[in-house]
Amino acid sequence: MSSTKNVLAIVMAGGEGSRLHPLTAERCKPAVPFNGKHRIVDFVLSNLVNSEIYSIYLLVQYKSQSLIEHIRQSWTMTRFIPQHFVTVVPPQMRNGPEWFQGTADSVYQNIHLIESFKPDIVAVFGADHIYRMDVRQMIDFHVKNDAHVSVATLPVKLADCNQFGIVETDDNHRIVDFVEKPQTPPRPMPGSSTHALASMGNYLFNADILLDALREAHETGHSDFGKHILPAMLKSHRLMAYDFDTNTIPGTEPYEEHGYWRDVGTIDAYYQAHFDTLGATPRFRMTNRHWPIYASPDQAESAQIENGVIHRSVVGSGSIVDGASLDNAMLRRSVVVERDARLEHCIVMERSRIGRGAQVRRAIIDQDNDIPAHERIGFDLEADRKRFHVTASGIVVVPRQFFKPQSLQSTTPSIGRARPSVASASEGSGLKVAA
């Protein structure tokens, strides 16, 4: 059914990500690294491509250079099939010297792209979440129900409703109310006293309906899908709620959390989502050959491990672990961990070094940091707050280049008997190397 429809995807990747500061001090939210070699934006793009949706515009805005470079290096599709593309679209200011004023305004400012492509359906998706989704199943639902607009939904706790667009439906999944980030708890969803139905920020529009709605919203000064466009369409159009819980992904293991979806818009949520991917039976398995999450081509050498103990950790390519201890650690590419250093529940980003005897726990080390020998981070939070960002739950974030790196290349420790890590170490399963 859905294969007969011409689908254009528009991914809204302009989010500033202020709640992820300082990780977003130099990059936009979709460009923030995730796991051993991915960025957050890779999840929505992989879902679209795996769903055989190959015509994708990526709308960017804030601090977008690293995202643009990532797309150029990782998501360049064939030049010989015109409708296969992932194209970055910065603000064009076609309607005046203004940046995007909201989600709907970002699409309106690029309305010419929709008009020239002439799709049947426009998929307007966010770029801020960790999940797998077969978008074709949502398209089938959209077509089967003669929907003008379909909104992907899932249950959230009532206490968290002020972070989401909340929908109310009738018995046939038609949306009868839509409130963006309500300040008072909404009515629970049918069959639950503790949860309401929330929008995932993923929408399907019939193209003609979307074009009319965007033009009308522009005339009235409305700029946001959740705040303005969707509530205004309730009486005049058929809006349907797609139940994300019904979405099935091939290759999902029985131990994985069904319908895993995480909004990683805060440091705490971002940190926890990493550890959902670790271990032999993770909540969310990064490797699935039937539904891969694509990453940039890896030109680095294999990781090298000499002695030390590694438990339930990821060691990125080009990294060196020399007689150190890793417990629930996530090392991205080209990280060096020197002898007698210890990392516990840590995320360490590219080209960082953990000096000899340093101890770090419950921390995120942004890229290009040279942690001094015998440094202690995460053990005295009051002292850490004077230097770093520390969340209410005690997660320490060391900003990019806080510890100015010296020449990482010239001081890389020599490992005469270095061994490449086994593949599973860089893909998320635990690895223990005995001394």
Curated annotation (Swiss-Prot):
Keywords for this protein: ATP-binding, Carbohydrate metabolism, Glycogen biosynthesis, Glycogen metabolism, Nucleotide-binding, Nucleotidyltransferase, Transferase
The record's top EC class is: transferase
InterPro entries named among the record's database cross-references: ADP-Glc_PPase, ADP_Glu_pyroP_CS, GlgC_bac, GlmU/GlgC-like_hexapep, NTP_transferase_dom, Nucleotide-diphossugar_trans, Trimer_LpxA-like_sf
Q: Which GO terms describe its molecular function?
A: ATP binding; glucose-1-phosphate adenylyltransferase activity
Which EC number(s) are documented for this chain?
2.7.7.27
Please state the pathway this protein functions in, per its UniProt record.
Glycan biosynthesis; glycogen biosynthesis
Q: Which residues form a coiled coil?
A: none
Question: According to the UniProt entry, where is the signal peptide?
Answer: none
Q: Name one Pfam family in it.
A: Hexapep_GlmU
- Sequence positions that bind alpha-D-glucose 1-phosphate: 165, 180-181, 199
The catalytic activity, as recorded, is:
alpha-D-glucose 1-phosphate + ATP + H(+) = ADP-alpha-D-glucose + diphosphate
Q: Where is this region: Disordered?
A: 408-435
User: Mind listing the GO biological process terms from this record?
Assistant: glycogen biosynthetic process
Checking CDD domains in the record gives: ADP_Glucose_PP (cd02508), LbH_G1P_AT_C (cd04651)
Assembly and interaction partners: Homotetramer.
Function of the protein: Involved in the biosynthesis of ADP-glucose, a building block required for the elongation reactions to produce glycogen. Catalyzes the reaction between ATP and alpha-D-glucose 1-phosphate (G1P) to produce pyrophosphate and ADP-Glc.
Family to which this protein belongs: Belongs to the bacterial/plant glucose-1-phosphate adenylyltransferase family.
Task: State the protein's name.
Answer: Glucose-1-phosphate adenylyltransferase
Q: Which organism is it from?
A: Paracidovorax citrulli (strain AAC00-1)
